[in-house]
Structures are given as C-alpha cells and as structure tokens.
A protein has these predicted regions:
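His/Asp/Glu-enriched, well-ordered alpha-helical/loop segment
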Residues: 1-69
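Active-site microenvironment of metallo-dependent hydrolases
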Residues: 40-119
C-alpha cells in the first residue's frame, strides 16, 4: 500500500491519493478509460470495503463522509488531480475551496478557463 504521507520514508508525500493514482496510471501505462475508472475506484471505495468499514457509501443511513471534486467524472478527477471543493465528515463541511479558474490574456481567446470537459 501507499499512503503518500510526507514522512522519513517518503519525503515527497502530499497525502493526496489522486496524485498516487495518477502516478500509478502513468508508470503502468494504464490510459484506457476502464483502467482509469478502476484506478479511481481503487482509491475511493475499495479501501473502505477492504477495511470492512460500516456506514460507508452514498446511501440512506451512511455516515456522509465524502469529498466533492471539481471534475465531471473519475477520469477527469485523475487527469486534473481535481480540486477538492468540499470535504464532508459526518454530514458537516470541514473544508471548502473555491473552484479553480485560470485567467487568460490571449487575443481572440476566452478570458478564463477551468480545463474541465465541456458538457
């Protein structure tokens, strides 16, 4: 396993499992959509199932522990190492970030871009 925590054994850690998954996808050359979705699943739902956590998931009666990402889907979350808009624990927002937006100054181009897929 890999927890990506900055400690004496791994000084480059950021505690960011999206970063770990992205690195793994690149190293293993897992660029197929199904492979990327499986990798996202491996850092989200699979660990809770392996640990036998109860009250985990998006169903009535669950703990409501979740992270809302600025991404349209799992592949985009991995591609962009998506911004965390909200971190929710037991139904309470414990961290919040503004959506990322890049301002541009290029003639004939939009004034801003968020690099998300357009629907």
């Amino acid at each position: 396993g890999h927890d990506c925590v900055m400690d004496p054994w791994y000084s480059l850690g950021s505690a960011d499992m999206l970063e770990v998954a992205s690195m793994g996808l690149h190293v293993a050359q897992m660029t197929g959509v199904e492979q990327m979705q499986a990798c996202f699943h491996a850092i989200t739902e699979v660990p809770a199932a392996i640990l036998g956590l109860e009250g985990y998931g998006l169903e009535k009666g669950c703990n409501a522990d979740l992270v809302i990402l600025q991404a349209a889907d799992p592949v985009e979350a991995l591609r962009l190492k998506a911004n965390r808009l909200f971190v929710i624990r037991r139904g309470k927002i414990i961290a919040q970030s503004e959506p990322l937006q890049s301002n541009l100054d290029l003639p004939g181009r939009p004034k801003s871009e968020n690099f998300l897929k357009q629907s």
